[in-house]
């Protein structure tokens, strides 16, 4: 039995703008999603083929996609609108054999204070045989310039035989410092394709590391 939250998710104008920037959404999407805002779950929806479960041992969620799932997507944006909010979140993705799905992630920070706001996201992917994932991740920051916006994304991929993952990562603007780490192991005939776009507006430090 899947979970469906038929609710009016309450977001202020700042959060709505962040959601549009990082997920391209003007409203709550159809299908599976998990929206996190200032350290708490703002809204969640699952489908018959995509389940989302809150972790019990640390901060984060498990996204479980059934074998053979095609033409479905899941959105998991993170919004920080309180100055000084800092978090480390662990999201694990389990993609069943033969599935072909799109995953849209990303984080938006609004910081109009003097404190540092930071989001460290650790995303681990487990792709079964012949599974395919298009993974889109966007980072965006804004504020009055007095407090720093920091994001440190880490992506770990485990691809079984014939699996394919395409990563599209975009740092839009407004991030002061970021370290991106990508690690993975690929079985026979598996492939990983990475596209990274970085805007250097306000960026003071950027580093990308890959270990494949």
Walk through the language-model features, giving the residues of each:
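N-terminal leader/transition segments
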Residues: 1-100, 104-114
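Loop-centered beta-sheet repeat module
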Residues: 148-204
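Extracellular beta-strand scaffolds
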Residues: 100-101, 110, 131-133, 163-165, ...
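Single conserved hydrophobic/aromatic residue that forms the stacking wall/gate
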Residues: 202-212
